[in-house]
């Protein structure tokens, strides 16, 4: 078999079409037991899980549904590919004012609770936590990991975040706003040496960040692209035409809150 160009290899890996992964999925699938790495199918529990941990295939800190080998492989082969993904941003609203009313240790505990809740919900919907930044989180929903319905997963995760933070009711334990967008993005490893990181870059990521900045507490702004790709039922939802910082064209988005 001819050697794939790096970009084509990345594209196949990110979309779930890499032949080597298919072989690994069959091989690891013969070992018990679930849960498993969503990419290579390595078992994380049972006898197979013991073996995987011994050879450093255990769950990755990046996401407990990815194994360390898959993450290391991504870092070992720098590069990436442009594919369609869905991106979710979630930010704490009024964090400066909240911090002013609390001791530093109390605020740190509150943010740790938020990060934990965000990571769990994102993981439950097969997203990958790209990073925690200040008072927010960024998640990527990639076809090879989240499936072809990655947009629906991103929307469901955003709704789950409202629920887990109490923003589906009148008294959230921490106020958050979120944004979801779907589009083409460069996904892969960037940087040099030990500073190399797996991430997504491009207008899709930037647009999601700008949407999130305009979402009020308890709101999710979902771009029409994400809504269409995710099969969102927009009956009764408010539609906003937004001017996003740094973009020449307006962006239309649907508003979802805890009661919708």
Spans of model-derived segments:
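Alpha-helical scaffold within the catalytic cores of cyclic-nucleotide enzymes
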Residues: 112-127, 144-178, 203-212
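A structural signal for short, well-ordered beta-strand segments
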Residues: 87, 137, 176-182
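Long C-terminal interaction/binding lobes of large macromolecular proteins
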Residues: 19, 29, 148, 240, ...
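Cytosolic regulatory/linker segments at or just downstream of nucleotide-handling modules
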Residues: 217-260
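N-terminal alpha-helical interaction blocks
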Residues: 1-23
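Catalytic-core segments of nucleotide cyclases and related cyclic-nucleotide turnover enzymes
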Residues: 181, 187-212
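Juxtacatalytic helix/coil linker segments
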Residues: 21-129, 133
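Short beta-strand->loop micro-motif that forms the acidic, two-metal-ion catalytic signature
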Residues: 133-147
